[in-house]
Amino acid sequence: MFGTAPSLAAFFAWTLSLLILMEILRTRLVMTGQVPANGFSPGNDGLSPFLQRLARAHLNCVESLPVFGGLMLLAIATHRTAVTDPLAAVLVAARIAQSTIHLVSTSAPAVTLRFAAFAVQLAIAAWWAWSLLRALV
């Protein structure tokens, strides 16, 4: 099982992978003349629903990285990875599941699964925050 540092690296890599995919697809649109180079908005408004979901999935990762990544970095910096190691890979797997579900479907069952994956991340982060506070105070 991955510990905290490899899981944090995986979180960064997943976020970067979503960004790279988005830029590959945007580049293709520009190169084929479908969209001018200055024709993109941050949310990919006016583009395909998939590209809009991809932008949102990437932004979800970026928005959550300070909280989840911050807790992992705190554990690493304070030598308290015993708190985060057991669930670090689970958190990243839940993040990848949430993003993947977001990309493939917007059906009600998919949204419910996506929320469940996010709830797993929130529960883990809350546990980590509580445990780290107890260990550091």
Give short role names for the model-derived ranges.
Residues 59-73, 125:
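Core segments of transmembrane alpha-helices
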